[in-house]
Amino acid sequence: IFKNGTIIDPKSSYIGKKRLPLLLLDTEMVKTDRTMFSARGAGIIGFSTFGRNTKYALDKDMQIDFGLVEEFCEKHRNETVLMFGYTYMIWQYVIRALEEKGKTFPFSKVIVFHIGGWKKLKDQAVSTLEYNKRLSQVFGGGVEVHNYYGMAEQLGSVFVECEYGHM
């Protein structure tokens, strides 16, 4: 309960107390296939408590389920939408995949929380500024991005990056 309380307090100042429509930028397999269950799965399950009408953007083959995301986008077009995923996976399987297809999802307001995977992106020379810019381009202009640290290394102790880029 304490760890769950630790997760709730920092995020409520960013997303409010109301549960938002949640699009998980991952595959549901991470939750249903126990061989894939890890800190990643625990993070997804923990973060899911902040959402409602939760959907997974990626199919079992880590491809964007365009029909599902388009339907989610249409259903929640005039609402603030919450998204969560792992930094590298969002880059690889969402941002780059959408760019390659020349596709965007025009949400009116999106709050994205992402965690982990910066070491993998370092090899690709992706800065925080570039990451946030391209994330905003594929999900529309009203994107608020929050990078945070702590789920893998210290499950339950969460540190959200401030507006100046400090944790």
Model-based region annotation:
Residues 1-14:
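Conserved structural elements of the adenylate-forming
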Residues 16-25, 33-167:
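Active-site glycine/GP-rich loop and adjacent strand/helix microenvironment
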Residues 28:
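Conserved AMP-binding
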